[in-house]
């Protein structure tokens, strides 16, 4: 989480917290799913000899560490928040239920959803889709280091061009790596639009909420 590509960067974390605060003050109800790849990835761990289930469980724990770090950063800038975990681990976080999350967001809390889905073999993307559908979100914002969806990986192909909007059907037909297949199909089936944008540019989150077209909308 930061410039070094691993571990937790307090400066980057502070940037995220301030951006989230800005949007929260607009009256937007916010639920956040955070990954754990800066600490451990279950799939890559299994390729190095770890049991896949154990590896994924380690990855879930990594998301909890990141969630606690983000919670602390949000608290430092005055944003009330709750960490909700897919696996029981009180008092580190509250055990997630849809109703608990919705109630907290209606009370003005930013909810941070951690530990993925609570089950192995599911990615952070799938966990994000699941939580977005469960809490009946209007849109899922996918903050990445790229400013949208391209015809190819722009970090590898300089001729890649960006989409302002694209349908789920076209994403699947082109085999674009917006999210994993399970996550894409879940969003498509439940009519949850995704907006992909570069979260690492300070101020971009508010621009998205203000309606500026700085990323790519994926929709039915």
Q: What residues fall within each predicted segment?
A:
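C-terminal catalytic "cap/lid" subdomain
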Residues: 1-220
